[in-house]
């Protein structure tokens, strides 16, 4: 497409560009940029547009001879955005008047083409082909055109470095013809290239190798476009469809494969119907196909006149009608017929596979089951299609698909042809691209209607894919690590299916060496919805065939005695990754069978179990599975106990909260019930843990809030590990063939952990917190000398003050001292802020904002702790004063009699001072002289005991009472 300097990016008609310098296409017949590598037949089927113009405003006939050119009009975009590149052949631009002066400008789509005076255009064309070097287009002016939103378009380059020179737009397209208005002057004859020129054009096209891929968006469309009824436009569109049908009907029948496979119906349908069918199939092609058919890339530019807009409107309406009809068609026979045609496609194109790489893969329904096409969903109501907006995202970076082709080769060239890999090499700009390595064929297939078709098509292959154990590269991911990237069954391909494909398609077998290996795609919401329904219809089959995957495909439903919130908090699941050894075992059982039904696979597994095909590797795998589940259960939080304890009103038996009634698991894959021995070990382990916990709570006074999490962790090895869950979901050796029964969770009552009441637990909790907050032990043993000295000095001064003054005086002086300090500091800060003119605010703002409110729960805790001691004191006083025990009451009497003498010598404050001195001195002295002190204390104790025995011997009443 030629462009003027006034409207460089404009593919529209411009009548104000007469002052621009002429420009023409660079690179003649052999130029790589002259024509995309689309094949001789493909280019032959897409003839160029012809625009004949002169200095005067004469009517010009504009008619597209490219079938795919009009197909762009039937896309979902408005007509203003749906424009194609106009490829003009040098044989179409003529200057019939030999007297035309050099420099006279001829307007064609906003570009001036200067014709040589007195020269034959075809002679100049041949001369230009021979003189122009190949691959030397340095000055390129690539005008972006829009086929649909973001569709890559290939067009020739335009050098703009030939001012004031005769130039000709050339393009190797095959039979380029010119259409002229009937009432035009006879001086504008029609010229058609003869056989020599056509063969030269075909020979030149075989050298074209460079393909420029553009990522286009609506923002790149030019603004300078002619309005619908612009009076300034010198062009008039006259569409002669009858002549078009008469001239090109044979051409459609010659090239059925280049038109995307829909031309197979050419014998019984008119070219207009074929054109409409191609228009409907083209916009609905999915993004995985890589590129679009070669014939679609050749089009023309429209002048946006009334006739063209009416044609566009008609095509768009027909497209919508056809889209509604195609969803109800049964295209299964058509898909098979198109798959059989692929064997002769490459030969008909005449391309050299060693030089040209096709960027349009051959789509096969058998090997690409997850290919997203315009199909009906499973409920038959919602069509699943790919919009053209997604194509824009795939090409936003503007990178040629050939670059991705090389990365695909590196990723998939080393594996087995049937292996399935995660395609991590593809960048984010092409999330769902499937690229084929070689060949130039394009076969458009439509996924058959999946409604009620489980025995065939994709459903049958899903079962084969997951159940065959032959794919060594199958990626198995953990649910907890990547919950959104699970490999679905529909994204895997069986090796057996790939091996069947080359036998049916000989051409693809040659291309299979480099790039036929499919790559696993990232999931999209549409694909997830498809795969979710597929997986929901085959939950039992997939999990029975691969028993080592514990509910990997379906949503895992963990049957446990613990509440569901625990599993949600911890993020763990009973998902055990498949072992390579177990996969190899399954592979040995399945590799001889070629059946596609799950019943055949289950029969093979059952037969293998009956024959006793169990060896050492199986035992090792089972041990690994057991250890995996044991590790998982060891990590279960035991904070469940505390949560259920708080939820109950009174908990005398903490563990009894976790014994649940018998129930059977529903949904998900069936699992094996644990062995009787394993159940006994589980119950025994839980009982031992409960008894041990009760002893620890009673001896150490551990609170139920924080310590239970650590002490209740299982410590009895892998067999009895954890089995806090009331059952064990462990796969044993009999899983391979024996039919599975649902797991039954038995009601198990566990002994009480502790006989302590809730009040006692709270009391111990408060005391433990007080001891931890105030390290009295470290304080009285002088671990921190500064801290101990400060506390000891302050308390001693206060006690001495109380000894010298009254309590009221001491309290008053203390309050006055504190207020003097705070008020002085407050005034000082206010003066400093006034002098410095700063706004630091209140100096005690941080302390004022401290929340010291006592909650009702904390108050109740403290009161409960205090009431325990008050109740004990009241009970003791009643026992002593009511003489429940005479000896105890006598002891109290003797003690009080001795205290009368002490009170006569010392008052209460003096006793407190003495007590403080003893508290801060005796522990440290005892720590230093522990051995000697213990020796002398032992001697004193023995002497005291002997004296008491002598006294009791002399008092017979007391002796009898003690004997009783």
From Swiss-Prot:
Residues 776-964 form the Reticulon domain. Residues 712-723 have a biased composition (Polar residues). Residues 493-511 have a biased composition (Basic and acidic residues). May be involved in membrane trafficking in the early secretory pathway. Inhibits BACE1 activity and amyloid precursor protein processing. May induce caspase-8 cascade and apoptosis. May favor BCL2 translocation to the mitochondria upon endoplasmic reticulum stress. Induces the formation of endoplasmic reticulum tubules. Also acts as an inflammation-resolving regulator by interacting with both TRIM25 and RIGI, subsequently impairing RIGI 'Lys-63'-linked polyubiquitination leading to IRF3 and NF-kappa-B inhibition. Residues 1-32, 68-109, 179-200, 479-536, 645-674, 697-723 are annotated as: Disordered. Homodimer. Interacts with RTN4. Isoform 3 interacts with BACE1, BACE2, BCL2 and FADD. Interacts with ATL1 and ATL2. Isoform 3 interacts with TMEM33. Interacts with ZFYVE27 and with KIF5A in a ZFYVE27-dependent manner. Interacts with RIGI. Interacts with TRIM25. The gene is Rtn3. PANTHER family: RETICULON-3, RETICULON-LIKE PROTEIN. It is found in: Endoplasmic reticulum membrane; Golgi apparatus membrane. This is Reticulon-3. Its main location: endoplasmic reticulum. It comes from Mus musculus. InterPro entries: Reticulon, RTN1-4. Residues 2-795, 820-876, 900-903, 927-964 are cytoplasmic. Keywords: Acetylation, Apoptosis, Endoplasmic reticulum, ER-Golgi transport, Golgi apparatus, Membrane, Phosphoprotein, Transmembrane, Transmembrane helix, Transport. The keyword Endoplasmic reticulum applies. Pfam families: Reticulon (PF02453). Residues 1-24, 80-91, 516-527 have a biased composition (Low complexity).
